[in-house]
């Protein structure tokens, strides 16, 4: 069996702010905490990193800062999605230029391309930049769902190496494992179902929860990847309430509240994301107690 290019837990990093600006010192500290906690990679400027409200300059700077801070200790998969193919190519090209190990490219949102349009989008990126690409399929946010048939076609392209699957459809993992080739990387994009996803052959998760609990998430994934399902299930039971609580309000507000409570960064977000509600805060704190974080 071939080892996948990426595996384990890769936190979908928040982008901390202070007084409306990216807090670079806090971001560096968060990256160092993740690496010390044993995570297997880093994913800056994705959904949880509020990429939608970063300027292009900020987006590029956060990727550069992540790569510089990681210093090759773990791989960096840079968020580089856009509903404009030309813009996505530019973001992927920048990720390659600054030394990222791969790019995470979300399916084009809002303009709702056909399945053939989705294939053409990723084919164009594949042809333009020599950097490994992970397809990010999250239809609840994009209103498009890339089909297994298109993914099989994409798996034949040299630079499209795998997927972040946030559909919660576990059968997709089995299908892709059987039809996309043994080098195809399969990462869940949904913490609560990652255990089942890995049981179907997935290799890990791009995780929101790891922002708050890197050591615990790393232990969970190490157990699952080694086939110790009993220990992995114990970790699942300990973390599942936190998985849910971090989406008790619009993400990443609950995650930033949790990090603020731990003294790691401000809970500041950018509009239209507002701070977590009092009910969400209470739910997050209860979940953090369950997980042994406070």
Curated annotation (Swiss-Prot):
SUPFAM superfamilies: Aldolase. One of its GO terms (molecular function) is 4-hydroxy-tetrahydrodipicolinate synthase activity. The active site is at residues 136, 164. Gene3D superfamilies: Aldolase class I. PROSITE patterns: DHDPS_1, DHDPS_2. One of its GO terms (cellular component) is cytosol. This is 4-hydroxy-tetrahydrodipicolinate synthase. It comes from Phenylobacterium zucineum (strain HLK1).
